[in-house]
């Protein structure tokens, strides 16, 4: 819940001097990306901008405090300020910020700018007290914001110092409007106006000018002088001489003498107690100070000129001027030290009553009240956890004694989930083990079951499926039906374990159950995870179309719940890329992989390994070995600088081994084969993948017998576990083994099986990647004209892809090849005396490649009747009567030229 006062522009007071000269400068702010107002405290930055903002509608205001260094809090308030300015135009960003569904501030801002692209009016965003930001991530994100903000948006930043926002670059490009302390300092005329408004008896212009010069036009000093003069303690000029030459850091003594010592004791205590509040309203003041009518007291303090300012148009929220507020808080620690814990407790209770637990925690921590802090956490910690207030929760839990955690195991569980969210798996188990050792009877009942559900999640994340299964089953046995979150976790883990074991049907059912429960209870990240797992299972079963449809449901969920910035989004676009690649939709596959990299742009580069491997697969399928090599260099660097799940390593190894196969790099394959992991089992898709990598390397090295043993065992496992996509891949690799070993009939047998199975999987690129050897076999099958219709169509499609990307046979009949052919001593006399035209050679190459007449016409972009004429002419010149004879003739020519066909 956001505090309204932080999003309210300060109310323009009646007795302030209108800074006409500065407002004139600000009137052109819409021509700049950034308007920067900098000065020490008390120069009137906020007052000036509130005057400028008066009457503007398309403006958002965000007043910072120290707590805004938390990235999530900063994001929530900033987006809320934009929503205020645009009347709720950026709904997607608002939801993402509220639910913390973004990868980083920069990615959230990128989405914001997409939505703002449809907002065409001038727009202003004011951020006050930016000097309070010390988080470098926020500084970097705001630099991104300024670089990419729409042209119609102006950012207005108020700060006591020069912020780290790339100011120099903006200044050079004339995109910065600056107002500093010299310009903010009051002129003689403004000082005279100020005193005329504040004092009952006006002072002479010369006296006013001398006072202004004595304090260098410092607005706060002028306000203090007016206050002293009203209280008749000193003459205005005497106060001015005392203030001359001092600055904000040396005001304490003066404020004690001239302000605190000149109010009655009740007012003094009111000021000191209320100052602990960063913002205040009637209810807070009444509870913290004990005054019956808080609103009336605040208005009275405001009338006395005691540096109190309204924060909203309704007049409900107030705050002290930062300079005065800091002074009062320091004095409160001196004068009311004994009462201070009780004052903070009262503030915490009032914030809780108004529904602001995070503010209440701030005061409970300041009070050092562990019991109050514990009670707030017991009632609100999980809500704060679900809203990613992780830093605040971690600080709070550290402030509680261990005994308090033991008495409230829910808080131990919360601390463990915090560790899990930060991937501190070892610490999770250590914490839970210690708690179980020290908490009586914890090993039975619901809390133990919740511990086990979390432990199961940690175990599966850490690559220990057997332990994860044991713990998930225990949790599900002990958890009551109403404990939905832990039941979702345990069910999801059990489904993932079964996936790892190759029990795909049972795994799919559990993941569907997880999805149903997660949707019912709005646990959207587990709903998305379960859909991704379902898609992977369906892919492994060979049901790629159903996998596609499941992915569509996942994309719809992401759009509806604004989950675009979750790292899981990358997982989804990556498996979509794998599916597109299988279907030879390479451009779309590459775009999908690149979008996955974009999702992970704010994470460590190692997280991009899988998408990078997918990009390499696309290059390999296109036959673009130069690009593949360039990307492989980066992939191998990442492999050497990170720890990865076996699935990730298997996918990375796959593209490496295929590249070595295509380039004939036996040395690299042999070296890898000596050192690579050889899994004990092959009962899931990533273990099958690693063994397939091993078999491919063995085939490259001519170790046919070893490779055959591996592949036959893989096929046995794949058939028994119904890993149909893996079976399809295995058959293709077995085909290559038989072909290279000269076992042509075995090669044809398994190729026919692979083509038949591809009717279910839709595989194309898995055939294409095998290159020329695959092309030769498919030509022969097509020429035999014995393939069923579906297999015939797929074989022709695969040949087109091979020819398009690898330029196999088509390239052999280019002009250089024909010239060398005609000069060859063994060229048939018929060709020498009646040579084919260049177009007829192209047509012969396409006939040899398995193209039909219609496909040749499409390839060469001519009419089908023209192709028939070319074919008739080349048949006559070659002395052949039909297509199969032409193919055989082309094959003889290629063999004569030294091509292994």
UniProtKB/Swiss-Prot annotation:
Belongs to the MalT family. Residues 853-872 bind DNA. GO terms for biological process: positive regulation of carbohydrate metabolic process; positive regulation of DNA-templated transcription. PROSITE patterns: HTH_LUXR_1, HTH_LUXR_2. Monomer in solution. Oligomerizes to an active state in the presence of the positive effectors ATP and maltotriose. NCBIfam families: PRK04841.1. This is HTH-type transcriptional regulator MalT. Gene3D superfamilies: P-loop containing nucleotide triphosphate hydrolases, Tetratricopeptide repeat domain, Winged helix-like DNA-binding domain superfamily/Winged helix DNA-binding domain. InterPro entries: P-loop_NTPase, Sig_transdc_resp-reg_C-effctor, TPR-like_helical_dom_sf, TPR_MalT, Tscrpt_reg_HTH_MalT, Tscrpt_reg_LuxR_C, WH-like_DNA-bd_sf.
């Amino acid at each position: 819940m956001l505090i309204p006062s932080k999003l309210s522009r300060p109310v323009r007071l009646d007795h302030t001097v209108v800074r006409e000269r500065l407002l004139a400068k600000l009137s052109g702010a819409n021509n700049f990306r950034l308007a920067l107002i900098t000065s020490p405290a008390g120069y009137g930055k906020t007052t000036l901008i509130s005057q400028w903002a008066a009457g503007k509608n398309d403006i958002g205001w965000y007043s910072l405090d120290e707590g805004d260094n938390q990235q999530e809090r900063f994001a929530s308030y900033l987006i809320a300020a934009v929503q205020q300015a645009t009347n709720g135009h950026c709904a997607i960003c608002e939801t993402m910020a509220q639910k913390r569904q973004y990868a980083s501030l920069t990615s959230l801002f990128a989405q914001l700018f997409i939505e703002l692209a449809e907002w065409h009016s001038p727009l202003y965003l004011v951020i006050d007290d930016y000097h309070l930001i010390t988080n470098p991530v926020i500084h970097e994100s705001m630099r991104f914001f300024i670089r990419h903000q729409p042209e119609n948006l102006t950012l207005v930043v108020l700060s006591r110092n020069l912020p780290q926002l790339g100011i120099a670059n903006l200044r050079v490009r004339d995109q910065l409007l600056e107002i500093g302390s010299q310009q903010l300092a009051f002129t003689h005329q403004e000082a005279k106006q100020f005193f005329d408004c504040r004092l009952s008896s006006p002072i002479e212009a010369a006296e006013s000018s001398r006072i202004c010069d004595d304090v260098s036009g410092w607005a706060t000093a002028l306000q203090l002088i007016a206050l002293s003069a009203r209280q008749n303690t000193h003459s205005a000029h005497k106060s001015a001489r005392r203030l001359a030459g001092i600055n904000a850091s040396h005001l304490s003594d003066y404020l004690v003498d001239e302000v605190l010592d000149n109010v009655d004791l009740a007012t003094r205590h009111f000021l000191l107690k209320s100052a602990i509040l960063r913002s205040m309203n009637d209810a807070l003041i009444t509870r913290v100070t004990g005054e019956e009518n808080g609103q009336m007291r605040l208005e009275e303090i405001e009338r006395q000129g005691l540096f109190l300012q309204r924060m909203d148009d309704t007049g409900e929220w107030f705050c002290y001027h930062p300079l005065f507020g800091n002074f009062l808080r320091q004095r409160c620690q001196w004068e009311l030290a004994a009462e201070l814990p009780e004052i903070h407790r009262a503030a915490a209770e009032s914030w809780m009553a108004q529904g602001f637990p995070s503010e209440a925690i701030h005061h409970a921590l300041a009070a050092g009240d562990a019991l109050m802090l514990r009670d707030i956490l017991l009632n609100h910690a999980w809500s704060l956890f679900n809203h990613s207030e992780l830093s605040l929760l971690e600080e709070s839990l550290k402030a509680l004694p261990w005994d308090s955690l033991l008495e409230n195991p829910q808080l131990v569980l919360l601390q463990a989930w915090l560790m899990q969210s930060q991937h501190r798996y070892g610490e999770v188990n250590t914490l839970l083990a210690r708690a179980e050792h020290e908490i009586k009877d914890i090993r039975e009942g619901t809390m133990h079951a919740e511990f086990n559900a979390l432990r199961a999640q940690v175990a599966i994340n850490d690559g220990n499926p057997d332990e994860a299964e044991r713990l998930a089953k225990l949790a599900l046995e002990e958890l009551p039906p109403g404990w939905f979150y832990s039941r979702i976790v345990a069910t999801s883990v059990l489904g993932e374990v079964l996936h790892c074991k190759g029990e795909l049907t049972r795994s799919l059912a559990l993941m569907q159950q997880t999805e149903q429960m997660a949707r019912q209870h709005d646990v959207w990240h587990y709903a998305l995870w379960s859909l991704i797992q379902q898609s992977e299972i369906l892919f492994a079963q060979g049901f790629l179309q159903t996998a596609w449809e499941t992915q569509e449901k996942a994309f719809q969920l992401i759009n509806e719940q604004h989950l675009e910035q979750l790292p899981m989004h990358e997982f989804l676009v990556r498996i979509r890329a794998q599916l597109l690649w299988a279907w030879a939709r390479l451009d779309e596959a590459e775009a999908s992989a690149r979008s996955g990299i974009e999702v992970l742009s704010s994470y460590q580069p190692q997280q991009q390994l899988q998408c990078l491997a997918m990009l390499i697969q696309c290059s390999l399928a296109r036959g673009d070995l130069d690009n593949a090599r360039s990307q492989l260099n980066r992939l191998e660097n990442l492999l050497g600088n990170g720890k990865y799940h076996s699935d990730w390593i298997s996918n990375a190894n796959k593209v490496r081994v295929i590249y070595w196969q295509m380039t004939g790099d036996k040395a690299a394959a042999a070296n890898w084969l000596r050192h690579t992991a050889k899994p004990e089992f092959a009962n899931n898709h990533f273990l099958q993948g690693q063994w397939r990598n091993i078999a491919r390397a063995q085939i490259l090295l001519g170790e046919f017998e070893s490779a055959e043993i591996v592949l036959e065992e893989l096929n046995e496992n794949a058939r028994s576990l119904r890993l149909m996509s893996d079976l399809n891949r295995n058959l293709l690799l077995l085909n290559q083994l038989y072909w290279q070993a000269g076992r042509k009939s075995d090669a044809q047998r398994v190729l026919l099986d692979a083509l038949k199975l591809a009717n279910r999987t839709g595989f194309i690129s898995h055939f294409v990647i095998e290159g020329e050897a695959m092309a030769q076999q498919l030509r022969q099958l097509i020429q035999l004209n014995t393939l069923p219709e579906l297999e015939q169509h797929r074989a022709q499609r695969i040949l087109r892809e091979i020819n398009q990307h690898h330029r196999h046979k088509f390239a052999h009949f280019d002009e250089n090849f024909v010239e060398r052919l005609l000069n060859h001593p063994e060229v048939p006399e018929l060709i020498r005396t009646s040579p084919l035209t260049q177009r007829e050679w192209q047509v012969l190459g396409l006939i040899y490649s398995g193209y039909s007449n219609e496909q040749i016409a499409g390839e060469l972009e001519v009419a089908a009747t023209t192709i028939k004429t070319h074919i008739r002419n080349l048949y006559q010149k070659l002395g052949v009567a039909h297509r199969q004879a032409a193919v055989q003739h082309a094959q003889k020519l290629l063999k004569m030229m030294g091509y292994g066909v």
